[in-house]
C-alpha cells in the first residue's frame, strides 16, 4: 500500500504544474519547486513533498519518468486559475491513493457537516480497518493537513478541526474531473450511476446527469438506461 507521506498545498502543485514543460527532464525543475515551496525547511521535507507531487500529477500519466510528458493537468493549470483547479487537484489525490479513498469514506461515516472533526476518532477508525501501522497514522495526519491547505477544514487545535462550508463545483469542473477520472483509470467509459463519489465528497456537486447531458456529443456520448448511465468518452 502506498502511503500519503507529506501534506501538500494547492499553491505548490498549481505553480509547479504551470512551470514544468513537456519534453524536459524532471530534475530541471527541482530547484524551481524549492523556490515555490518556500515554507518548507530542510532538504528532506522538500524532497519528500516533491516526490509526492511529481508521482501524483506527472508520473502517474506516463510509463517512464526520465522525460516529462504532457497531460491534462499540465494543460489545465496553464489555462485555468487556482480556484478552478483546487477541486480537480484534490480529486486526483483521492483517485490515486486507496488509503485516501478509504479516509474519505470513513470521514463521512463518522462526521456530518455540523460536527467538529476529531483526528483521534478518525485515526482509530482507520487503524481498526487497516491495522496499527505508522503508514496509516502518518497518511491520516498528512491528509488532514492537506484538507486544511485546500480550505476544506480549519484547525481548532492539534487534534480537532472545523468543517468549512462546501464550495459549489461548476459543471465545467465536474466535466474535467470526469475526464481526469477516465484518464487515471485508463478507460473510455464511465458509469456515472455507479461511480465512486468520493472524488466529489468535499464539494457541493451538481447533478451528474445534468453534466452528462450538457456535454453530450462534445466530450462524450451519453447513454442513459435503467441500470446505468454511461459516458463514452471521445
Each language-model region and where it sits:
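Short amphipathic alpha-helical segments
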Residues: 49, 99, 136-139
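Basic amphipathic alpha-helical segments that dock to polyanions
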Residues: 51-56, 140-150, 209-221
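Conserved binding-pocket/active-site segment within a compact domain
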Residues: 109-177
Amino acid at each position: 500500500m502506498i502511503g500519503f507521506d507529506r501534506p501538500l498545498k494547492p499553491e505548490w502543485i498549481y505553480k509547479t504544474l504551470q512551470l514544468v514543460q513537456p519534453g524536459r527532464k524532471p530534475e530541471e525543475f527541482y530547484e524551481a519547486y524549492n523556490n515555490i515551496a518556500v515554507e518548507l525547511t530542510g532538504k528532506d521535507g522538500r524532497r519528500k513533498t516533491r516526490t509526492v507531487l511529481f508521482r501524483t500529477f506527472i508520473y502517474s500519466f506516463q510509463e517512464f519518468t526520465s522525460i516529462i510528458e504532457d497531460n491534462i493537468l499540465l494543460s489545465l493549470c496553464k489555462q485555468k486559475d487556482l480556484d478552478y483547479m483546487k477541486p480537480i487537484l484534490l480529486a486526483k489525490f483521492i483517485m490515486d491513493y486507496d488509503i485516501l479513498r478509504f479516509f474519505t469514506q470513513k470521514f463521512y461515516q463518522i462526521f456530518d457537516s455540523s460536527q467538529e472533526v476529531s483526528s483521534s476518532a478518525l485515526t482509530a477508525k482507520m487503524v481498526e480497518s487497516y491495522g496499527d501501522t505508522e503508514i496509516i497514522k502518518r497518511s491520516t495526519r498528512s491528509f488532514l493537513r492537506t484538507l486544511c491547505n485546500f480550505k476544506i477544514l480549519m484547525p481548532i487545535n492539534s487534534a480537532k478541526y472545523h468543517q468549512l462550508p462546501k464550495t459549489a463545483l461548476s459543471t465545467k469542473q465536474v466535466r474535467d474531473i470526469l475526464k481526469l477520472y477516465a484518464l487515471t483509470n485508463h478507460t473510455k467509459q464511465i458509469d456515472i450511476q455507479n461511480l465512486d463519489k468520493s472524488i466529489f465528497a468535499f464539494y457541493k456537486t451538481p447533478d451528474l446527469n445534468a453534466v452528462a447531458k450538457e456535454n453530450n456529443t462534445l466530450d462524450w456520448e451519453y447513454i442513459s438506461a435503467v441500470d446505468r448511465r454511461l459516458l463514452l468518452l471521445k
